[in-house]
Design a protein with these regions (language model features):
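Ser/Thr- (and often Asn-) enriched beta-sheet segments in non-cytosolic proteins
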Residues: 12, 23-27, 35, 106, ...
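Acidic, Ser/Thr-rich low-complexity linear motifs
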Residues: 235-248
Length: 375
């Protein structure tokens, strides 16, 4: 009528149509009417936005775990430590959003951390050390959809402040380390159709303990146990298809393992410099430097993970909530080496690898260099 038509190809969407958690297509039915229909799969932004909670909490845990309880060289003085760490982090495909698992992801991170002791004293047969640290870092993670296609990339700029309290029983060597940390996250999730930004706060508390045993004069074995509880709150926002809301995220971790390493006296001693004034502070050969090494295998169990992401529009009944699980078990191996290069300066390097063996726990690798200066 009046030149109108309903033939195939008469209508088409000029650009992808998204609303809430779905993509929509324009279809012509047998009755020659045209309808908007949602696709079976969720739009790519669903796994992309849900992974923001996981990425931020993974970073917070790695940052807190980069601090060794051994806050001084032989524990004799206050010290300042500068650490630089970088590595890979990600999660395997365990069924994705459709099965309630964390989306598959893979990316990198890096941070610079400055830490300093504020107080070191002896109390009732205990050595007590307190201090603070600050860190600035960045992570970038590529996220995949349930079908293995690219969902997008999440970038996070993070600034952190933390404090620690270390107690060591003087006679037995039994120690406990308490850490409290807060992080400000500024995140951007980019897909083919959207750029979504969210800011938020992450918090973390950790209690770690260990008891060293001497196997030989220079070899030590130290069983360790650590409990970590962390949380994250991200601001709600909106993208081109509707609102995006985040529920408070939290998760808990238990790490059980041991550290095996040398326990040599790190006294600098007299060097081989031909100048008398340098013999107590300079070495000519690397073989003369006091060195300790260590390896630390662990099992990490992640449990009680929570964190919702909701998407929808103003239309009634459009809201959908996704709660991917981060529970699982991973095996972790860290190894390190430290050398005293001056009377008051120690250099350390370490590397590690974590592998998920069940569930949606994180996996990745890391490398770190640390400069420790006592005063």
């Amino acid at each position: 009528q009046n030149g109108a038509t309903t033939e195939e190809g008469a209508f088409a969407l000029s650009r992808p149509l998204q609303a809430g958690a779905f993509n929509y297509t324009l279809n012509r039915d047998s009755d020659e009417d045209w309808y908007l229909r949602s696709e079976n799969a969720y739009r790519a932004e669903v796994p992309l936005y849900t992974s923001m909670l996981t990425q931020a909490m993974d970073y917070d845990r790695i940052l807190a775990g980069s601090r060794s309880h051994q806050t001084g060289v032989n524990g004799e003085n206050n010290s300042v430590r500068l650490s630089i760490q970088g590595g890979h982090l990600g999660h395997d495909n365990n069924g994705g959003i459709a099965r309630g698992a964390t989306p598959e992801s893979s990316g990198s991170y890096g941070f610079v951390r400055l830490e300093g002791d504020l107080l070191r004293t002896e109390v009732a047969g205990m050595s007590l050390t307190t201090g603070v640290y600050g860190a600035a870092g960045h992570s970038s993670v590529d996220v995949k959809d349930d079908d293995g296609s690219r969902a997008g990339t999440v970038r996070d700029d993070a600034g952190s402040l933390g404090g620690y309290l270390n107690l060591t029983h003087t006679s037995s060597g039994l120690w406990a380390d308490i850490v409290a940390q807060g992080t400000r996250h500024s995140m951007k999730a980019s897909s083919d159709n959207n750029d979504f930004r969210a800011r938020g706060w992450g918090w973390l508390g950790s209690l770690e303990t260990g008891l060293p045993f001497s196997i030989t004069d220079n070899l030590m074995l130290e069983p360790q146990l650590q409990y970590t509880w962390q949380g994250l709150s991200l601001d709600d926002g909106q993208d081109n298809a509707g609102y995006v809301k985040f529920g408070h995220g939290s998760t808990q971790h238990v790490r059980a393992g041991f550290r095996l390493g040398s326990h040599n006296d790190m006294t600098f001693g007299e060097g081989t410099s031909s100048r008398d004034t340098l013999r107590d502070s300079t070495k000519h050969r690397v073989s003369e430097l006091p060195v300790n090494w260590w390896v630390q295998p662990s099992v990490i169990r992640t449990f009680s993970s929570r964190g919702d992401m909701s998407m929808g529009t103003a239309a009634a009944g459009s809201n959908m909530t996704f709660s991917p699980s981060r529970n699982g078990t991973s095996l972790d191996l860290q190894a390190g080496l430290e050398a005293r290069v001056r009377e008051n300066i120690t250099l350390g390097v370490q590397a590690g690898y974590a592998h998920s063996v069940s569930g949606s726990s994180a996996e990745g690798c890391n490398g770190q260099a640390t400069l420790n200066v006592t005063f």
